[in-house]
Amino acid sequence: MKRLETLESILERLRMSIKKNGLKNSKQREEVVSVLYRSGTHLSPEEITHSIRQKDKNTSISSVYRILNFLEKENFICVLETSKSGRRYEIAAKEHHDHIICLHCGKIIEFADPEIENRQNEVVKKYQAKLISHDMKMFVWCKECQESEC
């Protein structure tokens, strides 16, 4: 999906958020955001930690979990719960999209479908509601897993 914001603008917002919350600026917070931004995919806390440890051997998984909680609370990242691969994280500064998640291998596919979006808007309008957000996840067995089970 197309990114809506540059890494530098996200990091600038992060610095302002850290200051607003009365916290000290931390290179590790910026590094977690950078890893997620550059990956362009959904990463586990372990994958994020492994990536950061390439530069900083002292990074702990517990620090990464604390940082992820802060980033999620401040809407810098989105969390995706999957049954196979646990919590996965992605940068929030992307165009709206939905997810297809394979229950067997944990593969995640992002997609955007204008027809689905239009239909959701029609449903909201029918009930005279105001759509704030939505998150669609479809749990499937991907093509590869179906073929390997035959």
UniProtKB/Swiss-Prot annotation:
Keywords: Cytoplasm, DNA-binding, Iron, Metal-binding, Repressor, Transcription, Transcription regulation, Zinc. Gene3D superfamilies: 3.30.1490.190, Winged helix-like DNA-binding domain superfamily/Winged helix DNA-binding domain. The keyword Disulfide bond does not apply. GO terms for biological process: negative regulation of DNA-templated transcription; negative regulation of siderophore biosynthetic process. Pfam families: FUR. The keyword Cytoplasm applies. GO terms for molecular function: DNA-binding transcription factor activity; transcription cis-regulatory region binding; zinc ion binding. Fe cation binds at H96, D98, E117, H134. Zn(2+) binds at H42, E90, H99, C102, C105, E110. Homodimer. Belongs to the Fur family. This is Ferric uptake regulation protein.
